[in-house]
């Protein structure tokens, strides 16, 4: 997998490399044009299968061209162009919902965020009404400036955040060591999009996910700051320097200011990610102030982060105490952890539930682990080994001020810092693995993978350095093969699909327009049902003033969860009339993605044939049924054809 095994002495000409990259760029461009000209016209249960084959061929050629060029040489400008090619290819794949002109992407939380962004754009909701307004306000601004629909604006904003991740992962490695080979390895590691796990994050408008994608920008600034030359030694010196000599920016340092701005930005995108950052900075403060200075366990000439830690922590406290939900989430974490310690609650309930669901469709846990977590696990292991190796070398060096020349002392200290930060963040993340909130653990897993990617890339680079020169010729094809396998395994799961026994988060025109019409013409006192889930998210997105806490009572508590409950509803067992919306999303999800484990295709297709079930609305991808109790022979009312 190492793309840094080559050297500038391999004899490859710039002309040859540029020719290969030209082919790669043209292939990616041609594939993207084909995908752009083939927009989605109906619900797509798999974005992989629905996207035209020429796009995937072009993307494969793009990655192959970039990998071949960087394997030959990582130390010239052509290698930089190869990284750009890989970056463009990765961003294009991540932005496929935009390229394919999806109406919207994201079935759960993103639908609620769509409603909030719409409210903010219309002026019915203010910036301070939302716990995490950063993404919504950016969307409102972008939508208003570009004149695009709000759904389109949200897709563009989500793609923009993802692009920041792809760009800044290699920049972190470059800031860490300045080594071009390590930078290239980190770039290709970032192309694998390892933070996505399809349990609690993804490539859609999800505020935690977007903050997670933004975090590498902060991490890059943090590395640049702690490796920079301090102008002063303390905050007191900074103030005195300002009074005596010049502007406070010169005294405090530009990177301190950048970190403060980025920290506040993270708070506004999602305060939970900002809390992770505060814990990270707090760990660095302890390491610098206590471990390094008092115990002298390892050398650190790195610049401290005292001021920015205090500033971001204070801003975080001021922001979160305006909202009640932070207390409820904190209480759930504390209670779940306490119950798990006492043995009254099981850890990983969300994981257990998903495992049972996977087994119900004949999917093994081993299969899902390979598809979702094999490559990330390799990087986690490599990152941990890199931390242990770096710490061991620091202890082994008798003269801590003159470390071995094979690794830059400052880079070694940064790696050690990150390793210790991971050890501190680990228990905090594991606390979220307890009880019914275990799904939150996989949010933090994505955050932690940012460190694993950088440290894992450093470990791969170290392996490449110690490989004997005589083995290089055989190692390069092996590295190319491992890279191809890792990219394929990883990129096949950046979107949900039947490949991982799930359906894509595509929300098509027929679904939104169908619900919009049904909601507009509804009778407000009639209860809504649903297939597996009710229409709560659709109400969030489409009904002005609706948020999750203020949904109408008629849209909750009446959904069917399996075929027997559906048949009970259709047979008139309920004592009141019901609206039953069924979209193509429901049918394809249950039949194709979930292998009819809860609902059979026949039962879903024959809903309208049941006595007392009236088919009152259809648009080719959405159907609305009016279900009457058998004792009530009333005609359909409340929704027109």
State where each predicted segment sits.
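Start-transfer (signal-anchor) and selected internal transmembrane alpha helices
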Residues: 1-98, 478-481
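Membrane-interface helix-loop-helix junctions at transmembrane boundaries of multi-pass membrane enzymes
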Residues: 12-15, 248-250, 295-305, 371-374, ...
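Membrane-embedded helix bundles of polyisoprenyl
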Residues: 86-93, 140, 144, 158-247, ...
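Hydrophobic/aromatic-rich transmembrane helices and adjacent perimembrane loops
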Residues: 275-276, 420-423, 436-468
């Amino acid at each position: 997998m190492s793309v840094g095994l080559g050297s500038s002495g391999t004899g490859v000409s710039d002309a040859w490399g540029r020719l290969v990259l030209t082919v790669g760029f043209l292939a990616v461009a041609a594939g993207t044009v084909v995908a752009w000209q083939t927009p989605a016209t109906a619900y797509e249960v798999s974005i992989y299968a629905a996207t035209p084959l020429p796009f995937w061929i072009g993307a494969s050629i793009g990655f192959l061209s970039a990998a071949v060029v960087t394997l030959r040489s990582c130390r010239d400008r052509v290698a930089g162009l190869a990284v750009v090619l890989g970056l463009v290819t990765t961003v294009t794949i991540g932005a496929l919902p935009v390229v394919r002109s999806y109406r919207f992407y994201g079935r759960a939380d993103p639908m609620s965020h769509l409603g909030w962004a719409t409210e903010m754009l219309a002026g019915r909701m203010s910036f301070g009404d939302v716990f995490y307004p950063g993404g919504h306000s950016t969307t409102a601004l972008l939508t208003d400036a570009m004149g695009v629909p709000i759904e389109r604006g949200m897709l563009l904003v989500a793609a923009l955040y993802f692009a920041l991740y792809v760009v800044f992962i290699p920049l972190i490695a470059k800031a860490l060591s300045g080594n071009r080979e390590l930078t290239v390895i980190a770039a290709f590691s970032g192309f694998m999009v390892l933070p996505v796990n399809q349990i609690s994050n993804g490539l859609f408008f999800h505020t935690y996910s977007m903050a997670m994608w933004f975090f590498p920008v902060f991490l890059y600034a943090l590395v640049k700051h702690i490796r920079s030359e301090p102008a002063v030694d303390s905050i007191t010196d900074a103030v005195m320097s300002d009074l005596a000599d010049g502007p406070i920016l010169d005294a405090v340092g530009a990177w301190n200011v950048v970190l403060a701005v980025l920290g506040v930005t993270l708070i506004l995108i999602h305060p939970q990610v900002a809390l992770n950052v505060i814990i990270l900075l707090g760990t660095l403060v302890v390491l610098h102030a206590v471990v390094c200075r008092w115990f002298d366990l390892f050398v650190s000439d790195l610049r401290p982060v005292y001021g920015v830690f205090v500033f971001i922590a204070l801003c975080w406290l001021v922001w979160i105490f305006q909202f009640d939900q932070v207390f409820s989430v904190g209480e759930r974490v504390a209670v779940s952890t306490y119950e798990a310690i006492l043995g009254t609650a099981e850890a990983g309930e969300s994981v257990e539930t998903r495992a049972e669901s996977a087994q119900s469709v004949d999917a093994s846990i081993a299969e899902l682990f390979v598809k979702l977590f094999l490559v990330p696990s390799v990087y986690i292991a490599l990152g941990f080994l890199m931390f242990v190796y770096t710490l061991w070398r620091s202890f082994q060096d008798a003269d801590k001020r003159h470390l071995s020349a094979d690794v830059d002392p400052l880079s070694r200290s940064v790696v050690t810092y990150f390793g210790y930060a991971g050890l501190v963040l680990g228990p905090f993340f594991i606390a979220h693995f307890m009880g019914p909130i275990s799904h939150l653990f996989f949010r933090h897993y994505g955050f932690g993978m940012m460190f694993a990617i950088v440290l894992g890339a450093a470990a791969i680079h170290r392996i490449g350095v110690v490989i004997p020169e005589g083995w290089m010729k055989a190692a390069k094809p092996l590295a190319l093969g491992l890279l191809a396998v890792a990219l394929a395994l990883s990129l096949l799961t950046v979107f949900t699909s039947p490949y991982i026994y799930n359906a894509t988060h595509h929300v098509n025109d027929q679904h939104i327009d169908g619900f919009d019409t049904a909601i507009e013409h509804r009778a407000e006192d009639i209860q809504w049902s649903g297939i597996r889930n009710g229409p709560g998210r659709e109400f969030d997105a489409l009904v002005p003033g609706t948020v999750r806490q203020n949904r109408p009572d008629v849209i909750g508590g009446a959904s069917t969860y399996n075929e027997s409950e559906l048949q009970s509803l259709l047979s008139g067992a309920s004592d009141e009339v019901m609206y039953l919306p069924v979209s193509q999303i429901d049918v394809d999800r249950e039949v194709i993605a979930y292998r009819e484990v809860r609902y059979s295709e026949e039962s879903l297709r024959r809903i309208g044939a049941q006595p007392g079930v009236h088919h009152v609305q259809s648009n080719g991808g959405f159907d609305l049924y009016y279900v009457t109790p058998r004792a009530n022979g009333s005609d359909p009312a409340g929704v027109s054809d």
